[in-house]
Design a protein with these regions (language model features):
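Short loop/turn segments that flank or connect secondary-structure elements
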Residues: 1-252
């Protein structure tokens, strides 16, 4: 249910996710905003969905293998929505100068290594995504992992931006032996299947044209594509409109 006044709208939502229900009440502005300004809300909902998935894993008699200090999955081809891209660019600018320089250097180093090893990877990934070719996307991801390019935000095998980490990172959990994650063979790595993927919804909302814009990009491309990320953001809309569009997809 949505209560509206000229300045804000209150959303009272109850959404069935898997075998559980998410309930919340929150106020949102009726003023037009950029999608990335709602990222804390999307992160919160993602965390709730992940909590539900973990509860269902435990109920099934299994346990999550992931733990603090394990950075095995942090060399993957991490997808981020264009909205997240804008937020991460802003985040980098707030880092202390020495840390900001280090992160920028790591991005540049990884991009140079990728350009040397597989200069057409981004084009292949975009084509596979627009074709909805999940097997091809998976193969491209595994090929990228083999290049051993740790995330520029990784520090001492832990995420240095953990509270602001991408939705896809929040959603990635395994129940198989963590040793298998050193080389993620789909035959032995057992991922947790989430009842809903908030990241996919945000990709959709970030897209300006579903026929030519996937709405997401590889995290490693963040700084190299900074200008296109900024100008490629979806048209601003009232916060309540973004939220309603999101909830329609989450509950659908």
């Amino acid at each position: 249910m949505t209560d509206v006044n000229p300045q804000t709208a209150t959303v009272n939502a109850e959404i069935r996710i898997g075998n559980h229900t998410i309930r919340f009440s929150a106020q949102f502005s009726n003023e037009a905003i950029q999608l990335h300004e709602l990222l804390p809300f999307f992160q919160n909902i993602t965390d709730k969905v992940v909590e539900i998935a973990i509860a269902e894993v435990i109920e099934s008699g299994k346990r999550i293998s992931c733990h603090s200090g394990c950075g095995a999955c942090c060399s993957q081809l991490v997808p981020i929505s264009k909205a997240e891209g804008a937020a991460l660019l802003n985040l980098i600018e707030t880092l202390p100068e020495a840390r900001r320089s280090e992160v920028r250097s790591r991005f540049a180093k990884n991009m140079a290594a990728l350009e040397e090893a597989d200069p057409g990877l981004f084009d292949k990934l975009e084509k596979a995504a627009l074709d909805h070719d999940k097997e091809r996307i998976k193969a491209i991801g595994l090929a990228y992992f083999d290049l051993d390019l740790p995330c520029p935000f990784l520090q001492d095998q832990s995420c240095s931006i953990h509270p602001q980490r991408p939705l896809s990172c929040r959603e990635f959990l395994v129940v198989s032996d963590p040793a298998y994650c050193a080389k993620p063979d789909p035959a032995v790595v057992e991922n947790v299947v989430l009842p809903k993927r908030v990241s996919s919804i945000l990709y959709n909302l970030s897209s300006r044209d579903s026929n030519s814009d996937t709405g997401f990009m590889p995290l490693i491309q963040l700084l190299a594509s900074a200008e296109s990320i900024q100008i490629g953001q979806p048209t601003p809309a009232p916060a309540i409109d973004w939220v309603n569009r999101f909830l329609e997809r989450l509950g659908g």
